[in-house]
Amino acid sequence: MTSNQRMLFYSCIAKGTVILAEFASKEEPGIEDLALRCIENVPPHHSMISHTVHKRTYALIIDGLFSYFAILDEVVAKSESVWLFNRLKSATESLMEDGSTADSLDNPTQHCLQSKLDPVFAEIAAIGGNHNKDLELEFGSPRSIAREIKSNNQSLDSSKGRKGGALMPLLGKPLRVLKNKKRLQTEAKSEGHWNEKKMDLGGGGKGVRNGLIHDHHHRQKAKQIWRKHVWIVLMFDLCICLVLFGIWLWICQGFQCIDG
């Protein structure tokens, strides 16, 4: 796969079935109509949908009043698609906080936010190829980010502090090293978390087993004490009966009362 091959075919922000702003690849004529049909046929009671067919992934996230939809190449990692939706969501929230688009969002029309979100789509779609320079931002192009990482060795968290900056472009190879590093860190964290869970499970299993043994021992001891108390009561009753029988024999001088 070449570094300038496009992996993002389409992306949009919608309210209901109204497309507020969108990005569509010029190499995919008619993809806007396909995307609109997908949004119109979203099944009810779903907040997240992802479907891969013909080497393309159709993903949609519904967050409150807005829907975020994208058509991606199937090789795009899940973490990258999540970043895409988070970037679109943060851009929409910024516009809502600004208040300048309140009327447009109350009664939305097609592409009413297109001009305001074009820079965001340009940032997301930047791939660093010469034929796509018109889509690149000065601070959002993969080349500038690669240079910045090489010179300053900045972490991903510090990059998040720059509002509007590209954290992890979906396309191209300039951030391949960063993506591999992040994947290794994620795998290491997952392995550590899994080991921790196994340790917790082992300790918890031992605790449950010890608890069952202790409970069984307690029941056995309680049963033994109950039996002992029953025998004591029976023996006490027997002693009383024998004493009363002896008194009766003494008064009657044997069995003369019965004979009389």
UniProtKB/Swiss-Prot annotation:
Transmembrane regions listed in the UniProt entry: 231-251
Entry's localization field: Membrane
Bilayer topology: Single-pass type IV membrane protein
GO cellular component assignments: membrane
Keyword vocabulary terms for this entry: Membrane, Protein transport, Transmembrane, Transmembrane helix, Transport
Biological processes annotated in GO: protein transport
Primary localization class, coarse: membrane
InterPro entries reported in the protein's UniProt record: PHYL
Gene3D superfamilies hit by this protein: Longin domain
Residues annotated as domain Longin: 12-114
Stated role: Non-SNARE longin protein involved in membrane-trafficking machinery.
Family: Belongs to the synaptobrevin family.
Protein name as annotated: Phytolongin Phyl2.1
Organism annotation: Arabidopsis thaliana
Gene: PHYL2.1
